[in-house]
Every structure is written in C-alpha cells, then in structure tokens.
Amino acid sequence: MSCQAFTSADTFIPLNSDASATLPLIMHHSAAECLPVSNHATNVMSTATGLHYSVPSCHYGNQPSTYGVMAGSLTPCLYKFPDHTLSHGFPPIHQPLLAEDPTAADFKQELRRKSKLVEEPIDMDSPEIRELEKFANEFKVRRIKLGYTQTNVGEALAAVHGSEFSQTTICRFENLQLSFKNACKLKAILSKWLEEAEQVGALYNEKVGANERKRKRRTTISIAAKDALERHFGEQNKPSSQEIMRMAEELNLEKEVVRVWFCNRRQREKRVKTSLNQSLFSISKEHLECR
C-alpha cells in the first residue's frame, strides 16, 4: 500500500496508479482538535487543509509517530503532521523519568528492611554480659590502685576521643548503667587506657625506687663507739683523713660515717658556744642595768 496526499479536507487520492482499495477517510474533527497544541500550531494546522504537498512515508501498525483518528476504526492515520506544527507541543519525555531508578529502589527496599528489624533482647546470663561485669569491677579496682579518679579518666579520654567522655560516662560504665552496645565500645577504649596508665605508673615507681636507693640509710652508732669518738673529739676536733680512717677501722665503722659524725659534732659545739655566749651577754647586761 502506498502513501496518499490529500486534495481536499475529506478525501485522499493515491499517488500511484494502483486503484485497488481506495480508502475513504472522514475527518470528524479538525487537526487542531486531534492534539492539544499551542495557538501557533493550531493556526498552522487550520491552513494545512488547503495546501497540496507531498508527505513523508506513511507509518502503519503500532508506530508511535502516527497521529489522528480513523472514522469507526483503529487504523492509523495515513499522514503525519509536519514537524514544525509540533514545535510548540508536548516536550519529549526523558526515559529516566518514565522508569524508577533501580538503585534508588534497592535503597528504599533496604531501608524498609532495616526499619523492620527488631534488636533481639540481650541475655543477662550470657558470657558477654558476665565478661563485661568482670571487666567493669576490675577496671574500678585498678583505677583506684593507680590513684586516678573518674574525673581524671573522663578528662583523659575526652582529650583524645572527644567531649562525649566525662566523669558521668565512667561512673555509668562502672555501675553497668550503659547499653550493651555502648558498654562494649567503651570497654575497648578503657582497656587500652588502663594498659597505658599502668605502664606510666610502672615507670614512675621505678624512677622513685631508684631515687630512694640513692639515699643512704641512717647509720646507728653504738654507745661505746660514741664515747670513743667523744674522746677523740676532745683531743682533736678536726682530725685528718688518715686519723679518720684509723678510727673507723678501730670502731668497725665506715670512714664516711666517722667523717660525718665529726662534722655534726663541730656544728653542735658551735651552736652550744653561740648560745652560751648569748646567755653570758644577757646576764652581764642585766647586771649592769641593776647598778
């Protein structure tokens, strides 16, 4: 079947010599009524009935580019409106708007699935709960042993992990007042902090112990040794190094102990003399005032 060009508003004549099966076409509605287009397109279409021009190849079947309605049937229209008559008509619809994005659909489905999930209740006798209780008690004991308060721990963690840690957080953890999920997260953080705190404490104790070892213990001198040293002091209050060594060997004492004893004895003798002189001066002054 070939295309037809219209010579009037109501009938079409075949372009070729094939005269078999002329299809009369009755336009019950004007072209302007077939499609809701703009005024400009309506004017163009209203004047198109009096024009004679060739039309591109016809579209049959279910081709989406055919327009118009056949009288009493669903046979497609035998002509196509020029493209310029539809320039102000409906804009083309993009394919993404016609079909939903599968990624977005999957996301919505996943969101609905997660919203339906209900957290299973925690068994209070489970090994996880017992381990958490044991760690909370051990943490409290070790924290107190190291000399840290809950405030100290909260401030130390806040300086590293943020302001969500405070004394209240540590208190609630030790009293098992946090949710199981938050308590498990805090357990890992507190465990690491406790290890570091104990390492620092061990280094501090080692340093203090070294300083204490440097300080010598106080030596106790027997009464007989003190009497012998007093006799030597009466003879010579500033003995030489050889004399100090000889006295240390005789009294079975260390040389440094004997040297320090003589130094202390001279200081005490000096204080006694100073105090005695001050007393004598006061007595003399009072005696003169009485006269």
From Swiss-Prot:
Q: Which residues form a coiled coil?
A: none
Q: What does this protein do?
A: Transcription factor involved in the specification of the lactotrope, somatotrope, and thyrotrope phenotypes in the developing anterior pituitary. Specifically binds to the consensus sequence 5'-TAAAT-3'. Activates growth hormone and prolactin genes.
Q: GO CC annotations?
A: chromatin; cytosol; nucleoplasm; nucleus
**Protein family per UniProt:** Belongs to the POU transcription factor family. Class-1 subfamily.
Q: What is this protein called?
A: Pituitary-specific positive transcription factor 1
Where does the POU-specific domain start and stop, copy by copy? 124-198
Q: What is known of its domains?
A: The 9aaTAD motif is a transactivation domain present in a large number of yeast and animal transcription factors.
> From which organism does this entry originate?
Homo sapiens
Feature: DNA-binding region: 214-273
Query: Impact of altering residue 239 to S?
Result: In CPHD1; loss of function
The main location is nucleus
Give the GO molecular function terms. DNA-binding transcription activator activity, RNA polymerase II-specific; DNA-binding transcription factor activity; DNA-binding transcription factor activity, RNA polymerase II-specific; lncRNA binding; RNA polymerase II cis-regulatory region sequence-specific DNA binding; RNA polymerase II-specific DNA-binding transcription factor binding; sequence-specific double-stranded DNA binding
InterPro entries assigned: HD, Homeobox_CS, Homeodomain-like_sf, Lambda_DNA-bd_dom_sf, POU, POU_dom, POU_domain_TF
Key word Transcription regulation present in the record? Answer: yes
Q: Which disease is given in the protein's UniProt record?
A: Pituitary hormone deficiency, combined, 1: Combined pituitary hormone deficiency is defined as the impaired production of growth hormone and one or more of the other five anterior pituitary hormones. CPHD1 is characterized by pleiotropic deficiencies of growth hormone, prolactin and thyroid-stimulating hormone, while the production of adrenocorticotropic hormone, luteinizing hormone, and follicle-stimulating hormone are preserved.
Q: What is the lineage of its organism?
A: Eukaryota, Metazoa, Chordata, Craniata, Vertebrata
